[in-house]
Structures are given as C-alpha cells and as structure tokens.
Amino acid sequence: MHNQYGSLFSITTWGESHGPSIGVVIDGCPAGLPLAPEDFLPAMKRRRPGQLHTSPRQETDSVTILSGVYQQKTTGTPISLLIQNEDASSTSYEQLNDCYRPGHAQFAYEGKYGFADNRGGGRSSARETAARVAAGVVAKKILSSQGIKTLAFLSGFGPLENKTYPKLTDPLIRKVYSSPFYTILSQEEIQNLLLHDPEDSFGGIVSFITSPLPIGLGEPVFGKLPALLAAGMMSIPATKGFEIGEGFASAHMTGSTYLDSFIAKEGEISFQTNRCGGTLGGISIGQPLEGRVAFKPTSSIRKPCPSVSKDGEPITYKTPKQGRHDPCVAIRAVTVVEAMLDLTLVDLLLQHRCAKL
C-alpha cells in the first residue's frame, strides 16, 4: 500500500475504520511551531460524524499528541497523532463475508490482496480521512504563520450547483467554522432533496479557495501545483473529478475569452481575471488559488441493488437498517479537501525555499 503523501513535508496515515484507533505521523514540520491538543478541536468538529446531514456514528475525534511536541512547541522530529475509534459497530457488515457491495472497494481489495477487511470498509473507509484533517491542522498553522489563508466549502449537492468563488475574508472563515453545515447553496433545497428520497444518496462538489499565494509555489515539470493538488484530492475516498479555475469549462472557450489579461496596478503587475485559477505553468502567480473537487453519491444506500455472491450467484443487496452512512459524502469531505490543500501548499512552500540560494 502507498500510505504516504508529500515530500519535504509528508504524512503517513494508518489504521482502519473499525480498528481500535487511527492516526498519522507527520515528518518535516519545522521546530518551534506552537501546537497544543486544543488546536485540533475546530477542524475535527467540522469533520466529525453525528451532525446535520451526516452519518449517525458518534466519534469525539479527540487528538492525542504522542511525539514531536514539547512544552506545546514542535521539536522538528516526527509528530505522531492518535485518534481513538469509539463508536465502531461491525454487526451490519457480517453478511459481506459472502457477497459484494456495489460501488465499494471490497471487490478491488480482494482482487489485489486476496483478502479484505469488510468492517466499515477497513482501510478504504473515509474514516481514515480524520487523520488527514488532524495533519492538516499542523499544515494550516504553518501557512498562517506565512500569511496564507485557505478555505473549502460545499458548492454542489445533487442537481444543485453554485460555481462562484467568494473572496476569502476573515469574516467568511469565521462564518464557515461556526456553522454546523455551511454551504453557498440553499439549505432548504438540500433538505427537500433529502426528504424526497431518504433511501437514496447524492453526489456533491467541494470548492476551495486561498488568499493570494506567493509567486513560485509549484515545481516544473512533474511537481506542478495543480498536478500535486490533483493527486492529493483524488486520493480522498469517493472523489471522481478535479479542476483548477475554469477547469473543464475552459475546453468550450476561445482564447480571447479565456486568457487572463495582465494589468499594472499601483506599480505592480497583476491580472484582470483569474480564469486560470491562480497558476501558470503549474506555478502560483500571486493570485488566489481556486478549484473544485467532485464526489460521487454515497455507495451505501437503502434501495435494493443487483449484486452477486462470492460464488457468482445473483443476489439483491440492500444496506442493513443498522448501517450508518452519510447521505452525501461531500458534506464532511469539505474539511478533508481543505486539509489536502493545506498539506500540499506547505510541502510546496518548503520546496520553494530550497529552489534558489
């Protein structure tokens, strides 16, 4: 398995959905960064299940710092973070020993390894992303020390979509973090969709934005900022699409409508628009980074689905009533997208510091 992400600033996550705990080891964090257990609370609360429109699984997601921190300062050594699994229930997964769940990774894992942990998806479960969010807290503190702000939010839910990118401000950040379910969509329309067919699930889109980034983040040729971001975002469970700026819509434009014109403003060169999403040649250009990540509908639904037993016999699979799943994974994926954004930017920031003397 490939459990590591990043180069100079890297993370290695471990653990399974229904194991005793999950966690992450962070390597490459500079010494002297203030870090305390309470720093993890806001981000972990945003991702935590058991909230509005999410899985009823109850997890406190308290983060325990095992190493790499002394007197609430990072020491420059690997930081190990532990999160206990407190509410795992494996009874509803016992039937999976004899059949395959449509849309899940179980079939692929068994084909690759000859064995799979069916309890809650095991290693392939989105439960693993709690460790990424914890690591993202450390990355965000580094970015904040450099004046870089980041944010992700729900911009698509089923047939609902809003493609606008708001300007990143401190009031917006406070609003997002203080809300149990922030979105630029109509919450009433989302509620109506969920009530219309409670046995089904929905896909969604998560947008991300940053404050203007320093010029130079991203490495030619295979370390481009969008390329590394795409790898990070597409590693999140249930992702099916990624774009920067206008993304796929740019394929339907002409050059004259797409190009971001240069302008001189107060003695500095800038851009009239930001259709490129903040990068040229895969390198940041002093503009905000803007992009979106698409998530497929949750595979665990109450509606009957055609499947087969492990002997190849046709069956009808239906998620057990006691099973606990999100109606739309994109809702809780918001914090995961933000974490992967932060982790990628910190790694590239450190690489940029090494690019020239």
Swiss-Prot record:
One GO cellular component term: cytosol
TM region positions: none
Enzymatic reactions: 5-O-(1-carboxyvinyl)-3-phosphoshikimate = chorismate + phosphate
Keywords: Amino-acid biosynthesis, Aromatic amino acid biosynthesis, FAD, Flavoprotein, FMN, Lyase, NADP
GO molecular function: chorismate synthase activity; FMN binding
EC number: 4.2.3.5
Record carries keyword Cell wall biogenesis/degradation: no
A Gene Ontology BP annotation from the UniProt entry: amino acid biosynthetic process
Subunit structure: Homotetramer.
Pfam assignment, any one: Chorismate_synt
Ligand binding (FMN): 123-125, 281, 296-300, 324
Protein purpose: This reaction introduces a second double bond into the aromatic ring system.
Entry-linked HAMAP family: Chorismate_synth (MF_00300)
Annotated binding of NADP(+), by residue: 47
Cofactor: FMNH2
Family annotation (NCBIfam families): aroC, PRK05382.1
Pathway assigned to this chain's UniProt record: Metabolic intermediate biosynthesis; chorismate biosynthesis; chorismate from D-erythrose 4-phosphate and phosphoenolpyruvate: step 7/7
Cofactor comment text: Reduced FMN (FMNH(2)).
Entry similarity comment: Belongs to the chorismate synthase family.
Keyword check for Flavoprotein: yes
InterPro entries with a match to the protein in the record: Chorismate_synth, Chorismate_synth_AroC_sf, Chorismate_synthase_CS
Identification of the protein by name: Chorismate synthase
